[in-house]
Amino acid sequence: MTPLLELKDIRRSYPAGDEQVEVLKGISLDIYAGEMVAIVGASRSGKSTLMNILGCLDKATSGTYRVAGQDVATLDADALAQLRREHFGFIFQRYHLLSHLTAEQNVEVPAVYAGLERKQRLLRAQELLQRLGLEDRTEYYPAQLSGGQQQRVSIARALMNGGQVILADEPTGALDSHSGEEVMAILHQLRDRGHTVIIVTHDPQVAAQAERVIEIRDGEIVHNPPAVEKVNATGGTEPVVNTASGWRQFVSGFNEALTMAWRALAANKMRTLLTMLGLSLIHI
């Protein structure tokens, strides 16, 4: 089998005063399409840094990371953003939903930045929310949703551009046991549909539901069992195809981003006013 994600001798260090603190110390790891993997470790073990590198949110100090055979170090900023946008979906413990957008609008956000036309975005967002049992909550704002419902919205958002690889950082950490079980059931369904699911957790009960549990300690992998071979793993759903021309894609994306920015300002009128006053005082 050829790995979907391949890390070779990955190291990551950060400056701390006059010294360099090494957080990851020579990580080598292969993850295959269709796997459900848990990465476990104590706080400050390096598991979150590893997740950020896997999701192309951070770059290694040294070593090689390949996604579907592509060395990410050879990509410029735009190409890296495209790779991240088209291949990865992120699920966070605290959901990270935009409070001024409805559930449907939150799900649409990744496709806005991908330049997908509004009609296509709307149809796909509605389809995903319906699949996750939220067809009657599309116009609700995050504050009107339970924690479990907010996490389902974030899962739909992660799938908006295809989500070949789902990276879930403590996905049940902020949920009660019933909602946590529902979220894990959804992640299992995604794995069954061919998605590659990577869960970062400190909860042994959550980790036990994965096919492979990788343990990291002090920046090093201390346990990494062999992968379970998959038959006909497809690597997730097909990415959404954008039929718009390059210029139309740019205009559509710019207009939608501007609209979202305006909504954010309108939703935080007092903060916006204070910011404007602060800027005015600076120039007096």
Name each model feature, range by range.
Residues 113, 211, 276-277:
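Short, function-defining helix-loop hinge/capping sites that tune catalysis or transport
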Residues 1-13, 222-256:
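ABC-family P-loop ATPase nucleotide-binding domain
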Residues 209-215:
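Conserved catalytic segment of ABC-fold P-loop ATPases
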Residues 283-284:
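Conserved small/polar residues in nucleotide/adenosyl-binding loops
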Residues 242-279:
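N-terminal Sec/SRP start-transfer signal
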Residues 3-207:
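ABC family nucleotide-binding domain
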